[in-house]
From Swiss-Prot:
This is Junctional adhesion molecule B. Residues 258-298 are cytoplasmic. Residues 135-238 form the Ig-like C2-type domain. Residues 32-128 form the Ig-like V-type domain. The gene is Jam2. Gene3D superfamilies: Immunoglobulins (2.60.40.10). It holds the Pfam family V-set. It comes from Mus musculus. Expressed by bone marrow stromal cells (at protein level). Expressed in skin (at protein level). Expressed in testis by Sertoli cells (at protein level). Expressed by dorsal root ganglion and spinal cord neurons. The lineage of its organism: Eukaryota, Metazoa, Chordata, Craniata, Vertebrata. Disulfide bonds join 51-110, 156-214. The expression in Sertoli cells is regulated by TGFB3 through ubiquitin-mediated proteasomal degradation. Disruption phenotype: Mice lacking Jam2 do not display overt morphological, vascular or immunologic phenotype. However, aberrant myelination of dorsal horn interneuron cell bodies is observed. They develop age-dependent significant walking and gait abnormalities compared to controls. Neuropathologic brain analysis show age-dependent progressive prominent vacuolization in the midbrain, thalamus, and cerebral and cerebellar cortices. These changes are associated with reactive astrogliosis, microglial activation, and a reduced neuronal density. Similar findings are observed in spinal cord sections.
Length: 298
């Protein structure tokens, strides 16, 4: 009975698979499927990176590597490498880190190779280490003095916490959560973003004066910045209007005075006076004296 094209294709694929397996065995190498673990630990505590591979033998060779932008050796030739020498130890094929730091976070890979009847066998296991870090003291931006009716932003930020912290603003020791709904801040109009750490007053009022500080918090811990006082001053609109009116009046008086002086001819008289200056008189007198000098009479 003739076989269908699909059946022939499956036979060809099976044939190539068998050939590939025979090739690996002939070259004395086989690899097992790798595993992946996730380990989460708080900074400065201990963590165990386990190499979960099949049964190991005394002839097995172990290597631990950290994979990042490059590959760095952690355990090689039966010895811990780098700074792991002083703060880690080997327990069988596992690594016990006694004092985890945030720089330890990343992907680790253990490789176990051992001779078998079919050749050299390589087993690989992967461990993803995540280090949780408490927030540091956040950087807070609070203006010292603002005017009523203006839009004002207070900012809070932390760059060290993992996971990323949430931010809560406080005024005079009282938490400002979400939009105000009554209470001591019922005359305020503000919005607090707990993700970005921005507290925004859409139209600040005199009642918003006080001491403000921000707290950054995550699952590991919380820290807050020192309190800073913000003074809200009332904008004196009537005083500004009066000042503008006075300045405009002074400018108008100066302008009218200049026009009046021009009409009365004060500027033209001054010009005529400059034309009849003492210099011309001196010249005339000199000419008359020259005419009557006796030394020139014939």
């Amino acid at each position: 009975m003739a076989r269908s094209p699909q059946g022939l294709l499956m036979l060809l694929l099976l044939h190539y698979l068998i050939v590939a397996l025979d090739y690996h065995k002939a070259n004395g190498f086989s690899a097992s499927k790798d595993h992946r673990q996730e380990v989460t630990v708080i900074e400065f505590q201990e963590a165990i990176l386990a190499c979960k591979t099949p049964k190991k033998t005394t002839s097995s060779r172990l290597e631990w590597k950290k994979v990042g932008q490059g590959v760095s050796l952690v355990y090689y030739q039966q010895a811990l490498q780098g700074d792991f020498k002083d703060r880690a130890e080997m327990i069988d094929f596992n690594i016990r880190i006694k004092n985890v730091t945030r720089s330890d976070a990343g992907e680790y890979r253990c490789e176990v190779s051992a001779p078998t009847e079919q050749g050299q066998n390589l087993q690989e296991d992967k461990v993803m280490l995540e280090v949780l870090v408490a927030p540091a003291v956040p950087a807070c931006e609070v203006p010292t003095s603002v005017m009523t009716g203006s839009v004002v932003e207070l900012r809070c930020q932390d760059k060290e916490g993992n996971p990323a912290p949430e931010y809560i603003w406080f005024k005079d020791g009282t938490s400002l959560l979400g939009n105000p709904k009554g209470g001591t801040h019922n005359n305020s109009s503000y919005t607090m973003n707990t993700k970005s750490g921005i507290l925004q007053f859409n139209m600040i009022s005199k009642m918003d004066s006080g001491e403000y500080y921000c707290e950054a918090r995550n699952s590991v811990g919380h820290r807050r910045c020192p309190g800073k006082r913000m003074q809200v001053d009332v904008l004196n609109i009537s005083g500004i209007i009066a000042t503008v009116v006075v300045v405009a009046f002074v400018i108008s008086v100066c302008g009218l005075g200049t026009c009046y002086a021009q009409r009365k001819g004060y500027f033209s008289k001054e010009t005529s006076f400059q034309k009849g200056s003492p210099a011309s008189k001196v010249t005339t007198m000199s000419e008359n004296d020259f005419k009557h000098t006796k030394s020139f009479i014939i």
